[in-house]
């Protein structure tokens, strides 16, 4: 109701009739809301782009963007604030922002698996408790200083609890994002940080519920008790009544099948109903959505499907509105005078001191190294959206005034902003191994030293698994177990849309805190099909495949591959080609980013690298089957890469189901290279030393064939290895020879073959990473084959960075690499 000297703004109509009928669209709710959303998205995305080189999470850009649109910056202009964010429009903006926040808190609850808290190690639990207790105590101490100065009149008990929660909270979604950005998500320190943050999150929400119950306007202690007890009753009702119903829905959503739209609508309806109940009780509506997320079953397909459907709309559209709604309440200008700025420094110091010192001391007591302890302290000091939620609830309930609210928002920005640079400064994992530590960087060296072969297979999706399994089976040699070590790395993109819950689901196979490790058959059937496939292979072949996960932006995921290869002392990394074969046998690009990854790994890998051009190697998976057989052909021209391909093929030939043919090309005296070609350089011609090593490799191969023939003299079986020499006069004869072996299952070729025959081959191609022979077998119409191709590059410490010199490119790889 209006009073003398004041007027209440009238309600806004939803839509306008347009400017041509004399109406201003900005005086109507819908067009004004659209303008607000566009401005918010444009500003926050621009700030996120500017902060990307500093490796800051997007939440920093969104908080700063909200502040810039508020009274601290652009909002100082009366014309701007009355035009774009007039007071009468804020109810619609706040309602839409809080609706999105309800669903975001549901996603936050989905991140937490209560079962994982039971399995949290003593070390992570101790670190979490220390990271809560000391900051909470310091927060209470800080609140006394604030109440005696700038917060005089604030309710004592609610103010103490709100300040304690604000200083002790760790923003789990932001922490997960930062860990992934700095490549610590799957490390030991990342596991400890996530486990501790999970415990911290649960404790913080319980304390927040208590603070909300205490902060009712004019409420008596008895009323606060009723609110708190009603909240406890709501949680019990959700656990014993709502959760069984949701589990029934989840069981009706089997893995690999689309989720029924009705189930999604029912679940979102349950989230809204729970929010209504908690708001009706007197606890904030967000609490109900969070509880539903916590009790939601994490196994199976349903949780992932919900995240996929809700994530983009919530994080991309609704959440930035909440940051603006918060920024409109933040006025940095209220922090005036030495006293106020001194209190800001005090709040920041206590927030950092409590979290960092508490975490570091307990970590050192748990025998965590000093650099990791410091990194954990900085990581646990991460604030973010959850911090803003606590502060906004406190301000809306009158517990925090404008000045304290601004101080706490600046504290949240500062502590989060400093996390990444400080962690990178104190913790530098992944030191390169010395040559003495890591000797067998190639298959050729491994065979020579008679050591177990270590391979790393990278894959993009389950589509790659059958071929990988068949290639592993072919590589196991005679002794199935001790002579082969295999790592399978799943390449997953960390994109802008990846929420913490998606990342948690992606890395749960590595044993992070939100993975149900129950090994029952029911859980196994609903777990990741990739892990199931490798587990089945292990049981049948007795070759252990260790799953790994790389979660990074496409522009830097090659660093994960190279670092993992060095850490595991791998002899060869095998990468999938960036194209796949369609049913009509034509090539289709899976994703051009994978081509960039292959190029960068070839340049920076600490071991040999191979690119697998898959045309369905061996058909369907036939592990440990008596009819497992592959016909493999090595096209040998000479040089380091060809010898590495030969060494890998000889290793495969130890398998009883493998038939290997080695074809060596020898130029005749009148050999003529192809007419259209580029200049031949010395790098393409075998040096005398290289030629001698090639001859030695061929001599060893002949001796091996002779040994096999003598060992089989008492049987009618033939040798599995055939060596042939082909004397060629020109490029066309090379093509004709290759055609003779077009029915092979697999070709092994070097990326950069050497010698006069190889130097005479000129192939125009847009995939120079395959080399001339790989391109000939893959994309040239001269050779028609359905065989898969493995293009091998041997590790050489002094290998120059760049593409193969005997491939004429029609487009530059560097241009393609600009997109990631």
UniProtKB/Swiss-Prot annotation:
Task: Name the tissues where it is expressed.
Answer: Predominantly expressed in epidermal and cortical cells of mature roots but also barely detected in leaves.
PTM Phosphoserine: list the residues: 817, 819
Q: Which GO terms describe its molecular function?
A: antiporter activity
The record, for InterPro entries, names: Cation/H_exchanger_TM (IPR006153), CPA2_transporter (IPR050794), Na+/solute_symporter_sf (IPR038770)
What does the record say about its membrane topology? Multi-pass membrane protein
Induction cue: Up-regulated by NaCl, K(+) starvation and abscisic acid (ABA). Induced at acidic external pH.
Q: Name one GO biological process term.
A: regulation of pH
What is the annotated localization of this protein?
Answer: Membrane
Q: Which UniProt keywords apply?
A: Antiport, Ion transport, Membrane, Phosphoprotein, Potassium, Potassium transport, Transmembrane, Transmembrane helix, Transport
The residues that cross the membrane are: 30-50, 58-75, 90-110, 124-144, 159-179, 192-212, 222-242, 276-296, 313-333, 342-362, 374-394, 404-424
Question: Phenotype upon knockout?
Answer: Decreased K(+) content in roots.
GO CC: one term?
A: late endosome
Family membership, please give it: Belongs to the monovalent cation:proton antiporter 2 (CPA2) transporter (TC 2.A.37) family. CHX (TC 2.A.37.4) subfamily.
Misc. comment: Could complement the kha1 deletion phenotypes in S.cerevisiae.
Summary of the function given for this chain in its UniProt record: Operates as a K(+)/H(+) antiporter that controls K(+) acquisition and homeostasis.
What is the designated name of this protein? Cation/H(+) antiporter 17
Organism source for this protein?
Answer: Arabidopsis thaliana (Mouse-ear cress)
């Amino acid at each position: 109701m209006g009073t003398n000297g004041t007027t209440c703004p009238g309600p806004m109509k939803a839509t306008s009739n347009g400017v041509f009928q004399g109406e201003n669209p900005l005086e109507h709710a819908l067009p004004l809301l659209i303008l607000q959303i566009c401005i918010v998205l444009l500003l926050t995305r621009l700030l996120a782009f500017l902060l990307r080189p500093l490796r800051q999470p997007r939440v920093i850009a969104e908080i700063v963007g909200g502040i810039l649109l508020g009274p601290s910056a652009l909002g100082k202009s009366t014309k701007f604030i009355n035009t774009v964010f007039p007071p009468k429009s804020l109810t619609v903006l706040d309602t839409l922002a809080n609706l999105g926040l309800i669903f975001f808190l549901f996603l936050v609850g989905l991140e937490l698996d209560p079962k994982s808290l039971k399995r949290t190690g003593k070390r992570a639990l101790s670190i979490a408790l220390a990271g809560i207790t000391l900051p909470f105590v310091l927060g209470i101490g800080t609140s006394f200083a604030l109440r005696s100065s700038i917060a005089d009149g604030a309710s004592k008990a609610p103010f103490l609890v709100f300040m304690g929660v604000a200083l002790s909270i760790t923003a789990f979604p932001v922490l997960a994002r930062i860990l992934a950005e700095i490549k610590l998500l799957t490390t030991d320190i990342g596991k400890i940080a996530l486990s501790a943050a999970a415990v911290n999150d649960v404790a913080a929400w319980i304390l927040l519920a208590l603070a909300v119950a205490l902060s009712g306007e004019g409420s008596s202690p008895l009323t606060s008790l009723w609110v708190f007890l009603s909240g406890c009753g709501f949680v019990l009702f959700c656990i014993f009544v709502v959760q069984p119903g949701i589990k029934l829905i989840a069981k009706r959503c089997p893995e690999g099948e689309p989720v029924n739209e009705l189930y999604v609508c029912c679940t979102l309806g349950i989230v809204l109903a729970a929010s209504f109940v908690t708001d009706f009780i007197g606890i904030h509506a967000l609490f109900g959505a969070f509880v539903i997320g916590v009790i939601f079953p994490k196994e199976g397909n349903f949780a992932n499907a919900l995240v996929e459907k809700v994530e983009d709309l919530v994080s991309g559209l609704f959440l930035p509105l909440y940051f603006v709604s918060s920024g409109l309440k933040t006025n940095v200008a209220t922090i005036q005078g030495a006293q106020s700025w001194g209190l800001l420094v005090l709040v920041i110091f206590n927030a950092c001191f409590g979290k960092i010192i508490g975490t570091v001391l307990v970590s050192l007591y748990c025998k965590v190294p000093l650099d990791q302890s410091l990194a954990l302290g900085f990581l646990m000091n991460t604030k973010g959206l959850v911090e803003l939620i606590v502060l906004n609830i406190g301000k809306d309930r009158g517990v925090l005034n404008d000045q304290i609210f601004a101080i706490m928002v600046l504290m949240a920005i500062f502590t989060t902003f400093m996390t990444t640079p400080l962690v990178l400064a104190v913790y530098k994992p992944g030191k390169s191994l010395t040559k003495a530590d890591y000797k067998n960087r190639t298959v050729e060296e491994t065979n020579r030293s008679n050591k177990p072969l270590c391979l790393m297979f990278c894959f993009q999706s389950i589509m790659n698994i059958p071929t990988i399994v068949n290639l592993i089976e072919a590589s196991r040699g005679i002794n199935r177990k001790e002579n082969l070590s295999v790592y399978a790395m799943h390449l997953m993109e960390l994109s802008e849309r990846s929420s913490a819950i998606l990342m948690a689901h992606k890395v749960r196979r590595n044993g992070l805190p939100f993975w149900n490790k129950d090994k029952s058959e029911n859980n196994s059937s609903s777990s990741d099909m990739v892990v199931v496939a490798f587990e089945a292979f292990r049981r049948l072949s007795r070759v252990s495949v260790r799953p790994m996960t790389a979660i990074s932006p496409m522009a830097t995921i090659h660093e994960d591959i190279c670092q993992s290869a060095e850490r595991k002392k791998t002899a060869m990394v095998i990468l999938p080609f960036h194209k796949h074969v369609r049913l009509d046998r034509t090539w289709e690009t899976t994703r051009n980013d994978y081509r960039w990854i292959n190029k960068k790994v070839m340049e920076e890998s600490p071991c040999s690298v191979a690119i697998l051009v898959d045309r369905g190697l061996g058909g369907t998976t036939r592990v440990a089957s008596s009819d497992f057989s592959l016909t493999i052909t090595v096209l040998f021209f000479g040089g380091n890469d060809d010898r590495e391909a030969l060494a890998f093929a000889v290793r495969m030939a130890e398998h009883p189901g493998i038939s290997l043919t080695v074809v060596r090309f020898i130029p005749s005296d009148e050999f003529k290279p192809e007419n259209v070609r580029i200049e031949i350089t010395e790098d393409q011609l075998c040096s005398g030393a290289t030629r001698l090593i090639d001859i030695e490799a061929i001599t060893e191969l002949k001796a091996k064939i002779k040994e096999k023939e003598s060992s089989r003299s008492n049987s009618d079986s033939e040798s599995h290895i055939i060596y042939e020499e082909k004397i060629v006069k020109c490029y066309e004869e090379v093509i004709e020879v290759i055609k003779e072996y077009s029915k092979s299952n697999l070709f092994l070729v070097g990326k950069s073959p050497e010698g006069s025959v190889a130097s005479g081959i000129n192939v125009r191609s847009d995939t120079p990473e395959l080399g001339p022979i790989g391109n000939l077998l893959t994309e040239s119409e001269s050779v028609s084959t359905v065989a898969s191709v493995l293009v091998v590059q041997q590790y050489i410490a002094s290998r120059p960075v760049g593409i193969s010199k005997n491939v004429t490119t029609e487009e530059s790889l560097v241009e393609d690499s600009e997109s990631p």
